[in-house]
Amino acid sequence: MKLLGWMHRKLRQNSNDVFKEFNNAAGGTCNCITGLAASDPATFLATANEYFTADNDFTNNHPSSPAADLFTFGGSGLLTIGTLGIAAVAVSADADEVDYDVDADADSDFDDNDDTAGDDEDQVDSAVTPTFTYAAPPPIEDATVVEKAAVAVVEAIAEKDDDTTTEDDLMVVSAELEKVLGGRNSGTAGDLVASARVSFAMGVDCPLQGFLFGSPVSDAESRLEQPRDSNGGRRTSLGELFMRTRFAEEKVALVAVEEGEDGGDIGAGGERDDRKAGKGGGGHKTTKKRSAKDEKVPRGDGAQASATVTKSKFHKILQIFHRKVYPESAALARNLTKKSRKRGSGAYHKPEPAASKLRCLKEQRAPGFGCCASRASFGGAASPIDGDDDDELNGSKSGHWIKTDAEYLVLEL
């Protein structure tokens, strides 16, 4: 038995059949997998056929929607999103030889849907994009209509009496004047209507413009619901602040014009008073002349006085508008008025007798610039000024404080 066992092992070691133990029913080292069935091709094909048969049964029980329904609203209509009304084309079997026009097919589909209802099997409904209807915007007013309305408002203001003319009317005319000037400077017709300020003449409701620039002062006071600040008072808008500043500037301009006219009359009256009274008392005579002029107005004829006041008022308004239209000429006239006033004041007030002292100080060499100067800088003992004046200028031997305009002028020179 031992000999047979040894021979059996030798034969198994020298044999090339590696998997012969798999078919050995007696056992061995690979008995764990000997229970598996051999792979039979016929059995495998039968199992696969059963699987695919079950898959076909599932497909028959749950059919998928046709591809045409994806482009219509009858089905899911998923692919109609973003198609913008492009119709789906039913392609026949010989699609390679025939060219289709998408627009023509879409038109034909629309005509068929309007006239007759065709067969659903032959034709595919065209994809229709839903449309939204909006209310028509209000017609935009023509620039000529707006301009005519503005001209009518200005003419109505011009026809008013002088007593009934208010500051709001002046603001309307000023705003229209700024529009015209803005259009003239830009050179475009569209800028004639555009303006950064609130237009008093137009009755157009612009809530955003009213929020940004505020409303007219008269309109703002008449509002029922007004914003309140923390203290309980009405909060002033930015537009009202601009309007108040504008009112203040125009009032200052009117006062300046009145002072200019009074100054001319005062100058003429002062010359007449100087001829009569001589040298002194110029300021006193000027005051008397102004009071006499004020007293003469109510004593004279009422119609003549009112005509004079009317003429002066419109003259002032024209001067304000002229200053806005031609700012360069207004500045030049202002400078000339200042020079004439200086010349007129020079006739009344003679220069002080300290000119000789100033001339002596100019002849000295220029000292150092500062709040004080040394005695040597003013020439010391060689100064042409006497001892008392030198002590007044130089409070101490080290320097002096500048007390008069003449000393400051010497330091500047």
Swiss-Prot record:
<keyword id="KW-0341">Growth regulation</keyword>
<dbReference type="GO" id="GO:0009630">
    <property type="term" value="P:gravitropism"/>
</dbReference>
<comment type="similarity">
    <text>Belongs to the LAZY family.</text>
</comment>
<dbReference type="GO" id="GO:0005886">
    <property type="term" value="C:plasma membrane"/>
</dbReference>
<feature type="region of interest" description="Disordered">
    <location>
        <begin position="261"/>
        <end position="308"/>
    </location>
</feature>
<keyword id="KW-0539">Nucleus</keyword>
<feature type="short sequence motif" description="Nuclear localization signal 1">
    <location>
        <begin position="275"/>
        <end position="298"/>
    </location>
</feature>
<feature type="short sequence motif" description="Nuclear localization signal 2">
    <location>
        <begin position="338"/>
        <end position="345"/>
    </location>
</feature>
<feature type="compositionally biased region" description="Acidic residues">
    <location>
        <begin position="103"/>
        <end position="124"/>
    </location>
</feature>
<feature type="transmembrane region" description="Helical">
    <location>
        <begin position="71"/>
        <end position="91"/>
    </location>
</feature>
<dbReference type="GO" id="GO:2000012">
    <property type="term" value="P:regulation of auxin polar transport"/>
</dbReference>
<keyword id="KW-1133">Transmembrane helix</keyword>
<keyword id="KW-1003">Cell membrane</keyword>
<keyword id="KW-0472">Membrane</keyword>
<dbReference type="InterPro" id="IPR038928">
    <property type="entry name" value="LAZY1"/>
</dbReference>
<feature type="region of interest" description="Disordered">
    <location>
        <begin position="103"/>
        <end position="127"/>
    </location>
</feature>
<protein>
    <recommendedName>
        <fullName>Protein LAZY 1</fullName>
    </recommendedName>
</protein>
<dbReference type="GO" id="GO:0005634">
    <property type="term" value="C:nucleus"/>
</dbReference>
<comment type="function">
    <text>Involved in the regulation of shoot gravitropism, and tassel and ear development through the regulation of polar auxin transport (PAT) and auxin signaling. Acts as a negative regulator of basipetal PAT, but positive regulator of lateral auxin transport. Involved in the regulation of shoot gravitropism and leaf angle through the regulation of cell development.</text>
</comment>
<keyword id="KW-0812">Transmembrane</keyword>
